[in-house]
Design a protein with these regions (language model features):
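AMP-binding/adenylate-forming catalytic core of the ANL superfamily
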Residues: 1-82, 92-101, 105
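AMP-binding/adenylate-forming catalytic domain of the ANL superfamily
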Residues: 78-100, 118-148
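Polar/charged alpha-helical tracts
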Residues: 48, 61, 69, 114, ...
């Protein structure tokens, strides 16, 4: 007999051969000014290895999240592979009876600006930080013309 540790589905994802713990990334968002909550999950990216990190962020009441400043904080707090490639600004989350964020719908919606009405941002260049995810950028990412760092 033996005992094996089995991780909860959704608590980790793989990006470019590395395991990313969503809780570690969510804790890093606590240091980003203007962020009340963050739910982190992996989303498939065409022609990429694994799932890219995406964070659905609830801004603190009456505050704006500076997405460029967020990139700098996350780069300081996390290994490069763990920094989410996509951000989604949301008003609130759908939760379970035990107050856990329902990430399934967020994962299914992915990062398509044509399907998601919330503001979306992408990390194309670490030095510049996050920028607005436009339909043109989305098409270039999906076609493999634009590779995420």
């Amino acid at each position: 007999r033996h005992i094996a540790f089995v991780d909860r589905v959704g608590d980790t994802f793989r990006w470019k051969g590395e395991n990313v713990a969503t809780t570690e990334v969510e804790r890093a968002f606590a240091k980003v000014p203007g962020v009340a909550e963050a739910a982190v999950y992996g989303v498939p990216v065409p022609r990429a290895d694994g799932r890219a990190g995406m964070a659905a962020i609830v801004p603190a009441a009456g505050q704006r999240v500076d997405v460029r400043a967020a990139a700098a904080v996350l780069a300081r707090e996390l290994p490069a592979y763990a920094v989410p490639r996509f951000l989604r600004l949301v008003g609130s989350y759908e939760t379970t009876a035990t107050f856990k964020v329902r990430k399934v719908a967020l994962k299914q919606q992915g990062f398509d600006p044509g399907a998601v009405s919330d503001p979306l941002y992408v990390l194309v260049d670490r030095a510049r930080g996050y920028e607005k995810l436009t339909p043109r950028l989305y098409a270039r990412i999906c076609a493999g013309e634009l590779r995420l760092p």
